[in-house]
Amino acid sequence: MLKNRKSNCRLRYVLAYTILYLILVGLLVLFFRLQNRSLVYHADAWRQHLRALAYYGKWLRGNLWHLLHDHSLTPQAWSFGLGYGSDVLTTLHYYCIGEPLAALTVFIPERFTKYYFEFLILLRPYLAGLSFSAYAEYMIGRKQLHGTGSCTTTNSGSFPILCGALCYVFSGTVLYLGMLHPFFVTPMIYLPLLFLGVEKVLRERKPRIFLVTVWLAALSNFYFFYMLALMTAVYALVRVIARTRGEQAIRNAGAGNAGAGQTHRRNCASWIPEALRRLLQLLGYAAVGTMAAGAVLIPILVQFQSDPRNATSHGLPLFYEKEYYSELLKNAVTFINHPLYDTELCLSVVCIAAVITLFFLRGHGQLKLAVIGAAVMLCLPAAGYVMNGGSYVINRWTFAVEFLFAFVLTVVWSDEQIRFRGKNIGRGLAFLLVLVTIALNIVIGYVRIPAGENGGSGQNGFPSEFADEQTAEEYMTAAGRNESAAVTQYAEETEAPAFYRYTGRDLTYNAGTQTQTSSTQFCWSLANGSVADFFKALGVNEEQNFSYTGLDDRTALEALAGVKYYTIAYDNDYEKQFVPYGFADCGTVEAWNSAESLQEKSGAVYGDDSWEPVVPTYHIYQNTFALPIGYTYTGFVQRSAFDAMDLTERQETLLQGVVLESEDEERMNAGKEDRQETGNGEGLQARVSGLEQVQPEFSEEKRTYTVETGDGVSYVAEADDGVSNALEGPAAPAADNGKETSASCFRVTKAGAKVTLRFEAAEEAETYLVLRDLDTGPLDGKDEKDGEDEKSDTQAEIQEIYPIHVTALRDGTALTDKTLNYKTEINQYYSGWKDFAINMGYRSHGADALEITFQSEGVYSMSELAVVVQPTEEMMRHAVDRLVCTMTDVDLHRNPLSFASSEITGTVNAEQDRYL
């Protein structure tokens, strides 16, 4: 009878919670629908999250086909459409792979993925509220707070739990971060369940909830699993110590031992072995749950070790800037658009009042310490650094603070020291106040908040940063009408080779995910570190080591990467200047796809006379030097010799010989000795011993240039004898730009200051601006800034980004221009790159000047500032040599549904030993 009564109470609670949740979330959706906005954030959600979810469903269906057709349980895990090609699991796990809710996309047709994506945005917070309710009901309903320094609770019904759950699910993580990055809400589901699992193990010795939750959390997202593991470890440590000590104290009191105090102290200390036993027990259960997810987690951890973001060392200040602390106070009651360090709270006013009340109540020692600890962590960058795995400072762990404050509200409301006059009336008014404050958070936040730097004008509030509402057909059109579709269509019409890659100007983020066409564009959080190392070694001007667009239009690198096509979205003379050497004009192509055409904003209905399809057109160029997926070398270059070369020499070297690491060289030398001494012609060592070390031929030339400085900038060149010469004015002396170049330094006291390098133009060549060991920083304050007072060292603050804009000139006429956004250590996207070779493009009649615009004040120093011209025809004859012996009969073994693969086969007919 009692069990049925509890079940009925829980059913009524779930029903009440569901109704209230639907009302409040309906208010949220209403703001978007009134502005004809979807719940898909136009930046990361459109570029990454939605594309990842759509491909995940396609990939799962492809693996089911692979199982039924090929009778293989081994998934086809390689996708050519993820940038240069990448592993599906390790690349997309961060977004969806492993999460049980996302796995249901296997049943969702691709055109309906957007609807399911929006459904998950609303479902995850609902589940988080249920998990919070389960934990709170166990802790408060069953009075599990004994022995912890907390006061007893009264039987105040489910009102406190319901209010805490609603405050939890309508906090900043859901209302803001969860709208931009929906999977950020997933750990909010698991955190209460992990804590509940710990309590179940400690009190009832039932590990089932804990084991299953650890397993699901490890499967769902390795990044948040790390955070959850730290939080659960701290929680378990505190709860085990408190509970074990409390139980020991009760036993000691029950023994009534009035004997010697020494015996009493020994009994009090006997809780330590028991606490260790319980902690080890929890650790064992956690290990079992984690190992159960090993098939997903282990590949992720291996990939994470080579992830370029993880390998980069960022700066760690002792305190945040003062703007952060002032923003934090506002953040407590409403959400901030694009907050500093992703610190988002948006707590209900009632929660804050409950926290204040907590410190006026007797007991609740653990909760008070937890609140103080959370406040300290919010104020110290070190907390964000540790919770982010030591990569950089970011506060995406604040969902735990929201959980804490919501639970404090539940505990305070349930405490016997809190009494409501008129009981039901008082509690009803308090409950109404909770609902009103949550509704106000939604209304004030979504209406008041202006659109951020990635959004629109902001006139319509937060929803203006989201994509327009779309039908299934319109979604397919918007997702597929891009340069990837145009290239794929053109390649099919012209019978392109089995493998090809494209690049271009203004590429769509992750467009190849849908078409599974390889490109030079990649924007996923977990990246292959080898690609970033390649960019660093060649000095490629790219924004981030995990998000990159192309190869800086370099002819040699385009050929080496197998880039077959170059696309231009805006077909004009300016854009055409960036097309690399060797690309033949193939005309324009319309990016049709299988979906219905997008309706015009006029509201014309498909089929009406006024309806016209919106079909983007792309200009396509085809590379005559594109190398296939398999090409060969007859010689090699030592890595040590390669590293000693100039940046532009390295790309020419890669056309002539394969670069071998030291262990590869040792293996080859061992093979040569083995063949000479024993005549053994078998084995791997003997087969590669025919490769010879090559001496690369270089056609690039360094130009001697003169430096002309404008207002607000001074140029200091340090000669070989150590003497520094400050050069300032319209015409500075010529700089010796030979092999032994001098160090350079620019002091910029005025944003927008310009420096012009003049040199002899080259014909039929690419022109590069080379900067080695680039470093930037604030002015030291010794000189006065233009029109301003002196600035002391303590006032000077390092910026996150120092943009450097470069324009190529010919007879004073601007040709091409590019920007280097140099990021400092305090920027979360800092890559550690300091060497750059900026390609200003190929021209038959090259540039004779480079104009450098420093868009921020500061000091810009570099060990080398060089102008290099690279004759293209002479360089690319080495690419022709690579076409002599290539892989033929190439089969990518692509899945017909997902286009994923697990093997590549082909034939190489070589007359001598070659390196493939």
Regions found by a protein language model. Name each.
Residues 47-48, 54-59, 63-66, 94, ...:
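Periplasmic/ER-lumenal interhelical loops and adjacent helix-loop junctions
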Residues 115, 174-185, 311-342, 371-421, ...:
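Membrane-helix boundary/interfacial segments in multi-pass membrane proteins
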Residues 1-32, 277, 281:
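Start-transfer (signal-anchor) and selected internal transmembrane alpha helices
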Residues 24-129, 166, 170-188, 306, ...:
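Membrane-interface coil-to-helix junctions
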Residues 107, 442-916:
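Soluble catalytic regions of membrane-associated enzymes that act on cell-envelope
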Residues 21, 121-139, 149-241, 281-301, ...:
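Membrane-embedded helix bundles of polyisoprenyl
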Residues 267-280, 355-377:
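Membrane-interface helix-loop-helix junctions at transmembrane boundaries of multi-pass membrane enzymes
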Residues 228-288:
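Perimembrane helix-loop-helix junctions
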